[in-house]
């Protein structure tokens, strides 16, 4: 699906990149994503030892395949993906599905996100605790902020 997305985006460009350039873009995106997830692995391993984890994401319909390919699926009790559940962030309903998957009251759940508008505010509106992980400068309104 990533290649299809890149093909669709490239088709809007003038002039359109050749096949080798499109392939290089796809390879770069894949390797960048793999690198980022590799950096997250130690944190996920540690958290998953003590807490049930649910992944809530706006994605294209293949998130479970991607996290399986990257070796991360084992850390998540459930994956809530916008393309599969029919609701997208910032709608709090997608976070409600995550709460339901955990089977815990919202006030016992910590939502960790990198977007104030798409993660923190909708999760907080359900009563979840929140943690913003963000390297970009904007005024924090979450309970806690972790900066790079």
Protein language model annotation of sequence segments:
Residues 1, 32, 90:
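Conserved acidic
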Residues 1-25:
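A metal-dependent, Asp-based hydrolase signature
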Residues 16-20, 41, 45, 52-148:
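Asp-based, Mg2+/Mn2+-dependent phosphohydrolase catalytic module
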Residues 25-34:
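Surface-exposed cleft-lining segments at the edges of enzyme active sites
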């Amino acid at each position: 699906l990533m290649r299809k997305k890149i093909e669709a985006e490239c088709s809007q460009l003038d002039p359109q990149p050749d096949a080798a350039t499109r392939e290089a873009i796809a390879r770069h995106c894949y390797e960048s994503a793999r690198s980022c997830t590799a950096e997250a692995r130690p944190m996920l391993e540690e958290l998953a030892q003590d807490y049930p984890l649910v992944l809530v994401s706006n994605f294209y319909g293949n998130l479970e395949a991607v996290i399986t390919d990257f070796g991360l699926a084992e850390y998540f009790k459930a994956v809530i993906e916008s393309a599969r559940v029919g609701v997208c962030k910032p709608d709090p309903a997608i976070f409600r599905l995550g709460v339901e998957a955990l089977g815990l009251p919202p006030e016992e759940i910590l939502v960790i996100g990198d977007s104030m508008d798409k993660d923190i505010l909708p999760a907080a509106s359900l009563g979840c605790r929140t943690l913003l992980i963000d390297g970009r400068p904007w005024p924090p309104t979450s309970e806690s902020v972790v900066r790079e």
